[in-house]
């Protein structure tokens, strides 16, 4: 139940170069998204853009990197919960991993998905839809908001 969520998870999905990092880097700096407690940012993919670590420190954001899908486990998340004691979690999810797998994962006690956001590069959307439709549909099935960028 949503009422039982102590630590909301904001799950940001999208294929490589879809604008996830830019979107999150901007959002984490905004007053409307500010909180007093700690934000745990879990990066599951390294794109072209990078986070400004000094700015992240100013927003009390700590970063954990998970490079391999098999390393994203309930045990690893539970360890992060103990180490960081976050007030919220933001996940930049790897676009080649099934979102449904994460949605079905056992999460640490009190954690729950609050919002799913999918970033889409409008210049490559048709190519991904034509060649990776099942992966894209899995990505957007439960998304709350789709952000299209690079629109012409």
Give the role of each language-model region:
Residues 137, 147-152:
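Canonical P-loop GTPase G-domain recognition
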Residues 89-90, 146-148:
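Short glycine-rich or small-residue beta-strand-to-loop segments that form or flank ligand, phosphate
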Residues 86, 143-144:
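Short, well-ordered alpha-helix to beta-strand connector turns
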Residues 130-135:
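Charged helix-capping and loop-helix junction motifs
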Residues 115, 144-145:
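Well-ordered beta-strand positions
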Residues 3-127:
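Nucleotide-state-sensitive switch-loop elements of NTP-binding domains
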Residues 83, 137-140:
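A short, aliphatic-rich alpha-helical micro-motif
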